Amino acid sequence: MFVRNTASVVRGTSRNYATLREIETRLKSIKNIEKITKTMKIVASTRLSKAERAKNSAKEYALADAAFYKNAETVPLEDAEKKDLIIAITSDKGLCGSIHSQLAKAVRLQLKQTPNADVVAIGDKVKGQLLRTNSDNLKFAFNGVGKEAPTFEETSLIANKILEGGASNYKKVSIFWNDPISSLSFEPSNKPVFNAAAIEQSPSFSKFEIDADNNVSQDLFEFTLSNEILAAMAEGYAAEVSARRNAMDNASKNAGDMINSYSILYNRTRQAVITNELVDIITGASSLD
């Protein structure tokens, strides 16, 4: 009887020690994750000011373009035989909440209205999501973006590739991007980019003093495309960095809560193990008497 009880005590103690080791391992893992998320939050906070400067700088050119087309009364062309082109802008990086999936959702909603539209994906995140649901619409994609604030040189190269792909042949070109509403929120937005034909047919285009140049409307389209992509990428980058900072802040808080819970559980389990061992020692001593 005594031998059987001893074996039971050993098994019970082993289980308690195993549970303690599991809790301790889990606790160390969560603490390491908390260190990573706190570091990523600091990095995102540092990059946010640079992203805001890039956004404000790029936005000035976009506002100048918008004022020109407003004064020219430019509108997209209506041509049933031609397709629309959607330029969807995200980045290659994740760990920033639902910012990429929200943009992909907005693009999918647009594709329900214009199912024959072509899509150019800028960034691996939107490309990956659209490949799963709308692979037939995806014309081509760019990656290696979103690591730093965009530059005009970078967006000019992207715009040139899109133009080489026949952007001038579409009746309407639209850019979809994440617009930072505040430091805590964003929303997917879209804006048109008017092609050369739409510019030439603007009711008030003739009011502007323009040198005799047959390619001026095409030059305007190409320059505007680069500007609008730059502004959208800069705003999207600022929204992403802000979203990543918020996501890492929430992750750090959640990790802190889990650390507190597991610390309490560890201490209670350790206390229970010590109590059980004392009971076993006292019981064993009583049996010997």
Curated annotation (Swiss-Prot):
This is ATP synthase subunit gamma, mitochondrial. It comes from the Eukaryota. Mitochondrial membrane ATP synthase (F(1)F(0) ATP synthase or Complex V) produces ATP from ADP in the presence of a proton gradient across the membrane which is generated by electron transport complexes of the respiratory chain. F-type ATPases consist of two structural domains, F(1) - containing the extramembraneous catalytic core, and F(0) - containing the membrane proton channel, linked together by a central stalk and a peripheral stalk. During catalysis, ATP synthesis in the catalytic domain of F(1) is coupled via a rotary mechanism of the central stalk subunits to proton translocation. The gene is ATP3. Keywords: ATP synthesis, CF(1), Hydrogen ion transport, Ion transport, Membrane, Mitochondrion, Mitochondrion inner membrane, Transit peptide, Transport. It holds the Pfam family ATP-synt. NCBIfam families: ATPsyn_F1gamma. It comes from Kluyveromyces lactis (strain ATCC 8585 / CBS 2359 / DSM 70799 / NBRC 1267 / NRRL Y-1140 / WM37). PANTHER family: ATP SYNTHASE GAMMA CHAIN, ATP SYNTHASE SUBUNIT GAMMA, MITOCHONDRIAL.
